[in-house]
């Protein structure tokens, strides 16, 4: 590592919590203990919770890329003739979060039975709608579709 001040940012996913048993008293998440680099302890580090649901996705800047890697934000648009209750089919995607028109719509995980996110009519607008996806596993899938039914494995 070159001399000087450096910044390392890590994202630790928290997919659940303990809801019973003695471990419920210590349900901590994140990094704990000493942090080392080549057996040298790193000091003056801090852990900050990231409120993903409150992320201002409308302010993100996107650049065209062939492979976003992971984790990665994706952005797209879709058109709605008449706003109605619908579902966003997320089957084939790994794990992530979805925003429609800048508002948090829900999360998905390939291991869950439910493979769709409900989009109430109130979240959609006639004409163009924006879709932002924060994908953690990036398996190469780049499309989602709307469905009039919930999708389950």
Task: Report the location of each language-model feature.
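Surface-exposed beta-loop interaction hotspot
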Residues: 29-57, 79-80
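Aromatic-lined ligand-binding clefts that engage carbohydrates, nucleic acids, or primary amines
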Residues: 8, 78-101, 108-109, 131-134
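A cross-kingdom feature marking solvent-exposed beta-strand/loop segments within repeated
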Residues: 1-5, 85, 104-125
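Edge strands and adjacent loops of beta-rich recognition modules
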Residues: 49-74
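Terminal leader/tail segments of proteins
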Residues: 87, 117-153
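Solvent-exposed loop and beta-edge segments used for protein-protein assembly and interaction
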Residues: 2-4, 27, 68-72, 80-82, ...
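Glycine/proline-rich low-complexity spacer/linker segments in large multi-domain proteins
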Residues: 13-43, 138-153
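Short, well-structured beta-strand segments enriched in hydrophobic/aromatic residues
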Residues: 2-16, 127-135
């Amino acid at each position: 590592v070159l001399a000087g001040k450096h910044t390392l940012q890590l994202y630790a996913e928290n997919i659940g919590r303990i809801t019973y048993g003695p471990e419920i008293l210590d349900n901590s998440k994140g990094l704990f203990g000493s942090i080392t680099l080549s057996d040298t302890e790193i000091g003056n580090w801090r852990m900050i919770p990231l409120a993903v649901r409150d992320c201002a996705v409308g302010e993100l800047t996107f650049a065209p890329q062939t492979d976003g890697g992971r984790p990665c934000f994706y952005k797209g648009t879709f058109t709605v003739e008449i706003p109605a209750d619908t579902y966003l089919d997320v089957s084939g995607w790994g794990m992530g979060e979805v925003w429609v028109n800048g508002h948090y719509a829900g999360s998905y995980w390939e291991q869950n039975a439910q493979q769709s996110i409900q989009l109430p009519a109130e979240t959609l607008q006639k004409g163009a709608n924006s879709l932002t996806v924060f994908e953690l596993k990036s398996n190469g899938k780049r499309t989602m579709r709307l469905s009039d039914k919930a999708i389950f494995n």
